[in-house]
Amino acid sequence: MKIIIALLIFSIIIIFHELGHFWLAKANGIRVNEFCLGLGPTIFGFTKGETKYSLKLFPFGGACMMEGEDDDSSDERAFNKKSVWARISVVAAGPIFNFIMAFVFAFILVCNTGYDIPEVVEVSEGYAAAEAGMQAGDVILEMNGKNIHFYREVSSYALFHEGESVEVTYERDGERYTTTLAPKYDEELGKYRYGFVGGKVVQGNLLQNLKYSVYEVKYWIDTTVGSLKMLVTGGVTLNDVSGPVGLVDAIGDSYEESVSYGYYAAFLQMLYISILISANLGVMNLLPLPALDGGRLVFLIIEAIRGKRIDPDKEGMVHFVGLMLLMGLMVVVMFNDIRKLFL
């Protein structure tokens, strides 16, 4: 059951990503030859109009295959016959649709569970917060100039800036205060602490829920970007990275744990995970790497600036090399995921 749930979540997110490309392609008069879910040989398919819709053997990934996207075509409705701005809109639509999906799911989640405001609930003696005079009821507004909307953002900031001092702006009784906190290592918990605990959950009205749904998506975008920075700087290693196999396992474990509290709790937990994955997929696809949407956008933006398209053969070669490297990375990550399952 847990594998089915995980594959269903992946499928919904991937289909919506590809629908972004599909709908914008149609809106710009581009011929779509095939719209598929999965990779590899076709298991099932049918043709409606000019487009073939198919289900592939391997249940990871998907594609919106447009006429003339990767090769020359004399068809006036080919991708490369359209204006550079039309092509930019089609390529960017996939990641943007991921963020839209994350927002919709976040709104449903926030309406049902509320959101954690960054209000201090308890201050621990012997740590910087108590020494600075912070009290329960203080609301964290900024950390080193970064706006804070959820208490989770405090924890994330501490993770991405472990052991670093931070300038905290907080509010008490309508007045703003600023102090600098130097974290102290907690031997028992095995981490650095500023010395306060929060996480008060509140229920908002419609407008507040809409606003905090945007913040929810922003939170996961920031978390993804912060994690990528840690990967580049060595804060995390490839052993800490999970691919499809690892995510399926994590989703399955999360489902089995949450369903013990009822199907409603499991539904909300799956929504939470879907927000994370959808926002993550949007960010990853916007990375300026060959073969990804972000890599294609780089070439299109260069074309828009210089007013002339880069040699299609050279661009195709760059994307091909990038795809091979990406596939190699996926194999490494998948092997690592499988290895961790048996540890």
Language-model segments: what does each one mean?
Residues 10-14, 65, 98, 102, ...:
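Alpha-helical transmembrane segments of multi-pass membrane proteins
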Residues 3-8, 88-89, 100, 270-274:
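Hydrophobic alpha-helical transmembrane segments
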Residues 3-74, 284-292, 297-306:
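Small-residue-rich helix-interface/hinge motifs
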Residues 135, 141-142, 156-198:
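PDZ-domain C-terminal substructure recognizer with occasional recognition of PDZ-binding tails
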Residues 51-54, 58-122, 328:
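Internal alpha-helical transmembrane segments
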Residues 78, 82, 186-281, 298-321, ...:
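Functional transmembrane alpha-helices
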Residues 28-33, 113-130, 135:
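Alpha-helical transmembrane signal-anchor/signal-peptide segments
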Residues 129-151, 217:
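Conserved PDZ fold ligand-binding element
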